[in-house]
Amino acid sequence: MVVSSAKIHPASVVEDGAVIGENVKVGPFCHIGPNVVLGDGVELLSHVVVIGRTTIGKGTKIFPGAVIGGDSQSVHHSAVDTTLVIGENCTIREGVTMNTGTVEHGGTTVVGNNNLFLAYSHVAHDCRLGNNIILSNNVMLAGHVTVEDRAILGGGSAVHQFTRVGKQAFIGGLSAVSYDVIPYGMLNGNPGVLSGLNVVGMTRAGFERPVIHAVRRCYKQIFEGPESIRANAAAVRDEYLDCPPAMEILDFIAAESDRALSSPNRGGKG
């Protein structure tokens, strides 16, 4: 279904069954598959491929060369309908690729709202991305990766499958992220190691200095304490019940995960 207010270039292909919302703009040489839903105001500039069971939220803009909704690249991929859901007001730049999920793990790849994907970044099968995230050029997310709100991943960084990147974490360019990165953490290098807190990001987000100081103290207690990371975190939990960002870090550490935790030293720890 294509509404009358949509503008589709005659050189593009919209297959029967696709749902095209109000004021959608599709430039030349795009291909929209039969199971695609484009929300109101979505814009495909040119040479964009949107296939699979893909839903794109209103106001999202996609640049040339992007391939959105292709099958999972997992060697265990089954030829069963799976989905990709992209939220509202995302910007998806040139050459970006995003895959649908796998039936073995729920079947859906989810991308939130207001995210920026720079050129040639990749979102693999079954990833879960929050809101207001930036993936810089050539960032690679393997399957089942979780990226929480307001995280920033520097150019060329690569994230191992099943890894979690916490809220407002900052990943330096060309870093190899093999283990979970705590909220507000900064990680750099290959192999990636924690290099402290994303204080600049916390300041820009409006956290006051006493709160940032408290989170720094919590960070030191967790990673410089006498026991394991998780034991240290559990031991100091009651000290930070009134400090939401510190509690986000502590809750993140306490949660179940398939990966160990990134630390200031090489190698993941628990």
From Swiss-Prot:
One of its GO terms (molecular function) is acyl-[acyl-carrier-protein]-UDP-N-acetylglucosamine O-acyltransferase activity. It catalyses: a (3R)-hydroxyacyl-[ACP] + UDP-N-acetyl-alpha-D-glucosamine = a UDP-3-O-[(3R)-3-hydroxyacyl]-N-acetyl-alpha-D-glucosamine + holo-[ACP]. It is found in: Cytoplasm. Its EC number is 2.3.1.129. It comes from the Bacteria. InterPro entries: Acetyltransf_C, Acetyltransf_C_sf, Hexapep, Hexapep_transf_CS, Lipid_A_LpxA, Trimer_LpxA-like_sf. One of its GO terms (cellular component) is membrane. Signal peptide: none annotated. Keywords: Acyltransferase, Cytoplasm, Lipid A biosynthesis, Lipid biosynthesis, Lipid metabolism, Repeat, Transferase. SUPFAM superfamilies: Trimeric LpxA-like enzymes. It is an enzyme of class 2 (transferase). CDD domains: LbH_UDP-GlcNAc_AT (cd03351). Its main location: cytoplasm. It holds the Pfam family Hexapep. GO terms for biological process: lipid A biosynthetic process. Pathway: Glycolipid biosynthesis; lipid IV(A) biosynthesis; lipid IV(A) from (3R)-3-hydroxytetradecanoyl-[acyl-carrier-protein] and UDP-N-acetyl-alpha-D-glucosamine: step 1/6. HAMAP family: LpxA. Belongs to the transferase hexapeptide repeat family. LpxA subfamily. Involved in the biosynthesis of lipid A, a phosphorylated glycolipid that anchors the lipopolysaccharide to the outer membrane of the cell. Homotrimer. NCBIfam families: lipid_A_lpxA (TIGR01852), PRK05289.1 (NF003657). This is Acyl-[acyl-carrier-protein]--UDP-N-acetylglucosamine O-acyltransferase. It comes from Sinorhizobium fredii (strain NBRC 101917 / NGR234). The gene is lpxA.
